[in-house]
Amino acid sequence: ASPRSAQEAWTERGDAPIVITDESRLLIEEISIAARDSELVDQTSGVSARVAISAIELLASNLERRALTTGDHPVYPRLCDLPPLLPALTGKLEMVYEGEQQGPEVVARKLIGMAVRKLFEGRFPELERDVPANPDEPGPYAPILTWFAAGNAVTLSDEMPFAEYAAELARVPGLEALAAPLGGAPEQRAFWSELVLDGLHQSVKLARHDLDSTVSYKELLKFQLVKPPRRGPRRGTGEIN
């Protein structure tokens, strides 16, 4: 078994041991920081520590559910566990007028995206933003972007057994090489692999589509870069820009 830090908590919930990792706590804290810095959130009402506490409680419940449905033992957080945490944000944050116009869930997803991007930029190599995603792009992200440019896609879910989830991530060349230096258990490296994909999405290099409990990543087409801004979520779709 891999070593675990003192801050990393084992939580016994019934017969399903779960692990709330340092990186998942850090990401939730970054979401709280993004909320405290956001002009869309009413700062006069304060951003309570209960936001992070509530998010961790919801995360633990989601991990427990996955342990019971998949039989995985123990269960670790994934980035695709974040959508079920939206109630922790929408129910605890008060929006200013502009935030209310966009909708609490849209604002909450933006805060999550900001936190993911900050963690991505802090842990992984700098992304060459001005170079198009093509086979000649230099750097560690070239194999990943080239693979997606060939028409491939990845679909992940918080309901997948870990073996299936890890196998889906392993299809993407270059992903494991980026995540491996961060160490930890295989489940933790898979978390970092997924964070790379979402970091590339937040950096406008990949498209992401949400549907029910699944998250899909695919090539970002040029026409997707020039879509007009929307005031709120599009009805009937989980697409996130």
Regions found by a protein language model. Name each.
Residues 44, 64-241:
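C-terminal engagement/docking regions of AAA+ P-loop ATPases
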Residues 2-76:
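Conserved AAA+ ATPase small/helical "lid" subdomain
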